Amino acid sequence: MNCLLKTFAAAALSLTTMAVFAVPSQLKTHNDTDFQSNAYVGPSLDIASPHPTKAHSTNSVFWGVVQVICGKRTGTCNALIKMKTDTASPVTIGQVTLNLDTGDITPKSLTANGFTITVIGPGETRITQD
């Protein structure tokens, strides 16, 4: 009986740990600005994501697609975030790092060129206009 309880406790702890460290199902971007945003990835941070976020909208990209865009399934992925990407003169907010294993995005806040990116949870950001 004691062995059975220990087995159940270990299984419950294992499931709880997996749930705590699980990656998000989607990468979500809430764009609360008047302009389209996009992430650029790749070795030179010059490959535009095929999933820009339109002005005043929320864009969700399945986590598996994020991994494909980043070119790997684990580790970290750097992305250069730009605004006004549907114009001839896009502006850069800056570079963020996405942990593909946990969904953690760093830095937690980034402000440049009149825009701010704020991380609001694993795999989730909000972009505002200053």
Which ranges hold each PLM region?
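Intrinsically disordered, low-complexity segments enriched in small/polar residues
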Residues: F21-D130
